[in-house]
Swiss-Prot record:
Pathway: Sulfur metabolism; hydrogen sulfide biosynthesis; sulfite from sulfate: step 2/3. Catalyzes the synthesis of activated sulfate. GO terms for biological process: hydrogen sulfide biosynthetic process; sulfate assimilation. It catalyses: adenosine 5'-phosphosulfate + ATP = 3'-phosphoadenylyl sulfate + ADP + H(+). It comes from Oceanobacillus iheyensis (strain DSM 14371 / CIP 107618 / JCM 11309 / KCTC 3954 / HTE831). It is an enzyme of class 2 (transferase). Its EC number is 2.7.1.25. The keyword Amino-acid biosynthesis does not apply. The lineage of its organism: Bacteria, Bacillati, Bacillota, Bacilli, Bacillales. Keywords: ATP-binding, Kinase, Nucleotide-binding, Phosphoprotein, Transferase. InterPro entries: APS_kinase, P-loop_NTPase. PANTHER family: BIFUNCTIONAL 3'-PHOSPHOADENOSINE 5'-PHOSPHOSULFATE SYNTHASE, PAPS SYNTHETASE, ISOFORM D. It holds the Pfam family APS_kinase. This is Adenylyl-sulfate kinase. Belongs to the APS kinase family.
Length: 199
């Protein structure tokens, strides 16, 4: 897929460490992964609001929103899902370089794709957050009506129904949204970020 030739990386005069120093916090990607309806978008949005109140520089990338623009030419085949996550990984890396804490809320069903994004970042810059919720509960919630459509055969390649979801092997954080409130979940992540001295 690498079609670019005759290009040279242009070094910048302002470094990532300079931006982190100015922002008074480390930059990182908080990578929320889980089934549709598990609570990724709700949790990541609530967390961003809390981080913002703590004067942290953040940006929130949501799966649906990104498919309205950057990834609007992609479908849901395994190949398109891989490219979707590759692009998000590259955008996230740019935002980390800009000194931001970037919150990404994507199903990102394949372990290999998540690992690829992790590999593009420094060791402590990728924080995988598994938003754990049973398929039964996600389907009962069904906030967008997608599970119903998938069961009726109106949507193909729907994760959890006729496409796989690979649970993270070693996530930094596991949030059980069946048993934890959004407020409790936000504080769990804030505690982690403070304990590891990101903020």
């Amino acid at each position: 897929m690498n079609k670019s030739t005759n290009i040279v990386w242009q070094k910048t005069s302002v470094k990532k460490a300079d931006r982190q120093h100015l922002n008074n916090h480390k930059s990182a990607v908080l990578w929320f992964t889980g089934l549709s309806g598990s609570g990724k978008s709700t949790l990541s949005s609530a967390l961003e609001k809390e981080l913002f109140s703590l004067e942290t520089h953040t940006y929130h990338l949501d799966g649906d929103n990104v498919r309205h623009g950057l990834n609007k030419n992609l479908g849901f085949s395994p190949e398109d899902r891989e490219e979707n996550i590759r692009r998000i990984g590259e955008v996230s890396k740019l935002m980390v370089d800009a000194g931001l804490i970037t919150l990404t809320a994507f199903i990102s069903p394949y372990q290999e794709d998540r690992d690829h994004v992790r590999a593009t970042l420094a060791q402590d810059e990728f924080i995988e957050i598994y938003v754990k919720c049973s398929l039964d509960m996600c389907e009962a919630r069904d906030p967008k009506g997608l599970y119903k459509k998938a069961r009726l055969g109106e949507i193909n390649n729907f994760t959890g129904i006729d496409a796989p979801y690979e649970e993270p092997l070693h996530p930094e954080i596991v949030i059980d949204t069946e048993n934890q409130s959004i407020e409790e979940s936000v504080q769990t992540i804030i505690h982690y970020l403070k304990d590891k001295q990101y903020i």
